[in-house]
Amino acid sequence: MRQAGDTVFVNKDDGQCDVAVIWSVLWQGRMAKYRSIWETYRNKNKPVIVVEVGGIKRNETWKIGINGVNREADFANDMVDGERWKKFNVELEPWKQTGNNIIICGQHTNSHQWRNNPPMSKWFDQKITELRKYTDKPIIIRPHPRNHVAIDTTKYKDVKMVGPRRDKNTYDDTDLADRLKSAWAVVSHSSNPAMTAVFSGIPVYVSEASLTYEVGNKTFENINNPEMPDRQHWANKLAYTEWWTDEIEQGLPWKRIKKRLADNYLT
């Protein structure tokens, strides 16, 4: 940013800058302090750039967007081509249903993404109840690895909770890829597991806040015959939501974001 001629203050902001930059919108642990920055700037209708862990190449690439995360963010990715997607070397596996399980993925309730949703246990109950109107397929409840939730699965038929098995060599990578091998579909509000499922060819059911909304299903009415749309244009746009560290150091995402800020947010 400084190389681009911008003035940058690190941890010295008093709310008077044009733009704030924070890490994540999960108001938990060391990140909880960023909530006041978020609220100060958004209440003044000032933009906030949010940096967070990527979902295409987790722990290798990083999402950078304006005023939120996932589909709530502005990534300045309206005009794209297919070249950047190739850099990720991620195969869009053919749509398929490798198993019979419907996996409902939870999220961290301290995240700004969850602000308009009920407690996680109630959300799980709502999704199970709605699914049971249309299917008797087995349902697996999969909580967020760092967000404990209790739910009585015995009141439902063929529903069980299976927590993520965390990779001890990483912060919160899990066994999701293995779990998808038995999946018919994945249900998620807006978390990264839906993205992994789409890459793996597993249909998803998501909210408008999810980055997979464009290629996801919107209603459980078709759970026995999910839509499986073309994903290439979606992937091409997705490629401009995440960046490698060296690209960030070169100012590549900042160049796009800065122009969008000037055009749409700073007057």
Describe each PLM feature range:
Residues T109-P119:
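Surface-exposed cleft-lining segments at the edges of enzyme active sites
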Residues M1, R30-S36, P118-E130:
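Well-ordered, non-membrane alpha-helical segments in soluble/globular domains
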Residues I128-T170:
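Catalytic donor nucleotide-activated moiety binding site of glycosyltransferases and closely related
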Residues Y171-K218:
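A donor-sugar binding/catalytic signature common to diverse glycosyltransferases
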Residues T61-G99, E214-T267:
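Leloir-type glycosyltransferase catalytic cores
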Residues W23-V25, V51-G55, G99-S111, P143-P145, ...:
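Short loop/turn segments at strand-loop or loop-helix junctions that form parts
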Residues M1-K87:
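Secretory-pathway glycan-assembly enzymes, especially type II membrane glycosyltransferases
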Residues M1-F9, D125-I128, H148-A150:
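Short, charged N-terminal beta->alpha structural module
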